Design a protein with these regions (language model features):
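Residues within well-ordered alpha-helical secondary structure of globular protein domains
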Residues: 28, 49, 83-86
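Residue-level preference for alpha-helix termini and adjacent loops
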Residues: 14, 37, 51, 59, ...
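Short acidic alpha-helix initiation/capping motifs at coil-to-helix transition points
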Residues: 21-27, 54-61
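Mid-chain, well-packed structural core segment of small domains
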Residues: 55-82
Length: 107
């Protein structure tokens, strides 16, 4: 059974209220990016990997929350970090792993 997506953080909602046109453009970009052969699960893991590689803490938290809502297991998210470790280095991998722990603890 597919879970519903988690609500965005309050700061995101406040930003969206302040800049509604940017929010609309953001939603359109997200919808356009979904077109293609990847299923939701694969796309979510790819987005997590990109967020990890870019060391974007907020994006890692968001991707993890959404992945967990899709039913992706914490162990699978941890494997994405392990796969990224040889690219981003051990200190960065440990930092990302703590971000994932934050997201997993909130579910």
């Amino acid at each position: 059974m597919k879970k519903s997506m988690p609500k965005p953080p309050r700061a995101f909602n406040e930003f969206s209220e302040t800049f509604p046109t940017l929010r609309k453009a953001w939603d359109l970009l997200g919808d356009a990016a979904k077109e293609g052969p990847l299923d939701d699960r694969t796309a979510r893991l790819v987005k997590l990997g990109v967020a990890i590689g870019a060391m974007r803490e907020g994006a890692v938290h968001s991707s993890a929350r959404k992945a967990l809502a899709l039913g992706i297991k914490t162990e699978e998210l941890n494997q994405v970090v392990a796969l990224a470790s040889s690219v981003i280095g051990m200190p960065s991998a440990v930092a990302v792993w703590t971000w994932l722990r934050d997201s997993s603890a909130k579910k």
